[in-house]
Swiss-Prot record:
Segments forming domain 2Fe-2S ferredoxin-type: 4-96
Gene name tied to this protein: fdxH1
Keywords from the named record: 2Fe-2S, Electron transport, Heterocyst, Iron, Iron-sulfur, Metal-binding, Nitrogen fixation, Transport
Entry-linked Pfam families: Fer2
Similarity comment text for this entry: Belongs to the 2Fe2S plant-type ferredoxin family.
Functional note: Ferredoxins are iron-sulfur proteins that transfer electrons in a wide variety of metabolic reactions. Donates electrons to the nitrogenase 1.
Protein's name according to its UniProt entry: Ferredoxin, heterocyst
GO terms (BP aspect): electron transport chain; heterocyst development; nitrogen fixation
Cofactor remark: Binds 1 [2Fe-2S] cluster.
Binding-site list for [2Fe-2S] cluster: 42, 47, 50, 80
Cited InterPro entries: 2Fe-2S_ferredoxin-like_sf (IPR036010), 2Fe-2S_ferredoxin-type (IPR001041), 2Fe2S_fd_BS (IPR006058), Beta-grasp_dom_sf (IPR012675), Fd_pln (IPR010241)
Cofactors named for this entry: [2Fe-2S] cluster
């Protein structure tokens, strides 16, 4: 099983840390396992509480049903159903910027 380095950043929340997450663990679950508290609500990809923005790297969020193609194209990802597919950098706490 592949494991990736996932950097989570949020200037407002004073987060800038890199954690290891395997390909079968969501970004949100990996963060929780490492003691990083990120916002969430549904845990099923059907709301926007946990939305982040992929700045670098590849992810799989094929299970999400909330974001439209334009939002996904801009890099937004629902971290509760997003799996790393490479080393990546993700801005957390992005719900206010989703519009």
């Amino acid at each position: 099983m592949a494991t990736y380095q996932v950097r989570l950043i949020s200037k407002k929340e004073n987060i800038d840390t890199t954690i290891e997450i395997d390909e079968e663990t969501t970004i949100l679950d990996g963060a929780e396992e490492n003691g990083i508290e990120l916002p969430f609500s549904c845990h099923s990809g059907s709301c926007s509480s946990c939305v982040g923005k992929v700045v670098e790297g590849e992810v799989d969020q094929s299970d999400q049903i909330f974001l439209d193609d334009e939002q996904v194209g801009k890099g937004f990802a629902l971290l509760c159903v997003t799996y790393p597919r490479s080393n990546c950098t993700i801005k957390t706490h992005q719900e206010p910027y989703l519009a």
